[in-house]
Amino acid sequence: LRRQRQMCIRDSGNTTRNADDHCCGQTYIDLYNICPSDPNMIRNIKASIDMVVNTPQVNDWWWIDAVQMAMPIFAKFGKMTGEQKYYDKMWDMYYYTRSQHDETGMFNQKDGLWWRDQDFNPPYKEPNGEDCYWSRGNGWVYAALVRVLDEIPSDEKHRQDYVNDFLTMSKALKKCQREDGFWNVSLHDPTNFGGKETSGTALFVYGMAWGVRNGLLDRKEYLPILLKAWNAMVKDAVHPNGFLGYVQGTGKEPKDGQPVTYKSVPDFEDYGVGCFLLAGTEVYKLK
């Protein structure tokens, strides 16, 4: 949390629009909900998000990692305050990233997966000629949809839009799971640095387990998929001393942070462990 807080205040304080800086706000909101006697805990993040809400700009989430870092905060403030403006702004920003950024948007509805940013939109191709769908990047969006759906009311006007995207992604992810239970860093090109990768796999397990538990995904269809992935991570990625292997380091595409191995130490491992723990929290809740 200290590291996230340093990131949150490193640039422009309450005036930042950067999702990197907003991310820690999710944790502060959760802490505030546990101990609401200290409003200072959310003062800064609320001021920053209110600034974003009260401006017409919607193009801040130009890379898909940002969807996970910032989008759930709007859902949390909408739930906390009961004000529709947070839900409306969240949808406007999500829709721009999804469908309008760089003209086509970042979401390929045909394939059910996301390009990481405009650098990877067509005509960019993987070595095998397929579009480039980075595993962890898609995992970030998948997790963001879960965290948003967990917060917004059942009658929120765009809830079904989020559900539809979640279901579309789920079908696409099911098709590209590896035989060993993991997902490759490149979801459509197993030859491009193919191999086990934990962070993306963990995010997919997190989302699928949540979907099964909440009745959005068919239990018979998706439970075997997510359990195969979870058991593979526990068996193959977790070291006896707790170190987590097969975690890709920082980057934005399959080639970054290579090689990814059982013993490789990523340059920033926090999110690998965090994704794994998120997956565990949802698998644990399954009955």
Description of each model-found segment:
Residues 1-9:
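Single conserved hydrophobic/aromatic residue that forms the stacking wall/gate
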Residues 3, 30-47, 78-92, 149-168, ...:
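Structural helix-adjacent loops and short alpha-helical linkers that scaffold large soluble proteins
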Residues 6, 22-34, 66-73, 109-134, ...:
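Carbohydrate-binding/catalytic loop surfaces
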Residues 16-32, 63-79, 134-150, 197-213, ...:
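Well-ordered alpha-helical segments within folded domains of soluble proteins
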Residues 39-74:
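Asp-box/WD-like beta-propeller blade repeats and closely related beta-sheet repeat scaffolds
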Residues 90-188:
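Active-site cradle of extracellular carbohydrate-active enzymes
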Residues 159-200, 211-257:
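Non-catalytic carbohydrate-binding regions of carbohydrate-active enzymes
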